[in-house]
Design a protein with these regions (language model features):
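Short, solvent-exposed loop/turn segments at secondary-structure junctions
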Residues: 10-12, 45-46, 73-76, 112-116
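Membrane-proximal helix-turn-helix segments that form the acceptor-binding/catalytic region
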Residues: 90-101, 125-141
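Short, flexible/disordered intra-domain loops and linkers
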Residues: 11-20, 75-90, 119-127
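Charged, often glycine-rich, active-site loop that binds/positions anionic groups
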Residues: 49-61, 123-126, 130
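N-terminal subdomain of nucleotide-sugar transferases
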Residues: 1-46, 53, 63, 102-103
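Glycine-rich, charge-decorated loop segments at or immediately adjacent to ligand/cofactor-binding or catalytic sites
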Residues: 108-109, 114-123
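Short N-terminal targeting/anchoring amphipathic segment
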Residues: 59-91, 103-109
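Glycine-rich anion/phosphate-binding loops
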Residues: 45-52, 83-95
Length: 141
């Protein structure tokens, strides 16, 4: 069966109780149930970096990927580490560039775009909203 890349900038939690944790696991399971070989690029930034290198090797070796499916976190991708510091801030954009370079179609489930609305600025203040807006937009670039 065809191979796909499944990406999430966080570790998956099969015991999650909220939709933002349940959905990624169910989507991963659904792709497997459909018969896809799933190349998993999830976990910590270090894990994703290692998995990205392995994926690059597979592509350079001629493996064909049908598509990439990505789940966003509820916070900016580069801030998903436990301390919210980006030890590998370019690993996820590098994955997207790699997919583009090899002509792999990509799909992104983007949740919680509350930061784009005026009430976010009112809740967190103008400076924080401006800074976070830049980081969120970087995710979408």
């Amino acid at each position: 069966m065809a191979a796909i890349v499944y990406h999430a900038p966080f570790p998956l939690d099969r015991e999650a109780s909220s939709a933002s944790g349940i959905r990624p696991v169910r989507m991963l399971d659904a792709f497997r149930e459909l018969g896809y070989t799933v190349l998993d690029v999830t976990g910590s930034a270090r894990e994703r970096s290692r998995r990205l290198r392995a994926l690059r090797d597979r592509l350079q070796g001629g493996e064909r990927i049908e598509f990439l499916y990505s789940e966003c976190a509820t916070i900016p991708t580069m801030l998903t580490e436990p301390r919210h510091l980006p030890p590998h801030p370019f690993v996820d954009p590098a994955l997207m560039r790699l997919m583009h370079r090899y002509g792999v179609p990509t799909s992104l489930f983007y949740r919680d775009i509350y930061w784009a609305f005026p009430d976010y600025r009112e809740r967190v203040g103008a400076a924080m909203a401006a800074a976070m807006g830049c980081v969120y937009r970087y995710d979408l670039a």
